[in-house]
Curated annotation (Swiss-Prot):
Expressed by the skin glands. Its main location: secreted. GO terms for biological process: defense response. Transmembrane segments: none annotated. Keywords: Amphibian defense peptide, Antimicrobial, Secreted. Antimicrobial peptide. This is Caerulein precursor fragment R3. It comes from Xenopus ruwenzoriensis (Uganda clawed frog). It is found in: Secreted. One of its GO terms (cellular component) is extracellular region. It comes from the Eukaryota. Belongs to the gastrin/cholecystokinin family.
Length: 27
């Protein structure tokens, strides 16, 4: 349903966010 889709998107977003925060150099 919509809730599980939202949960998946949120988890994916968090994964991408932490990847960018941890992997990309801050300028």
């Amino acid at each position: 349903g919509l809730a599980s889709l939202l949960g998946k998107a949120l988890k994916a977003g968090l994964k991408i966010g932490t990847h960018f925060l941890g992997g990309a150099p801050q300028q």
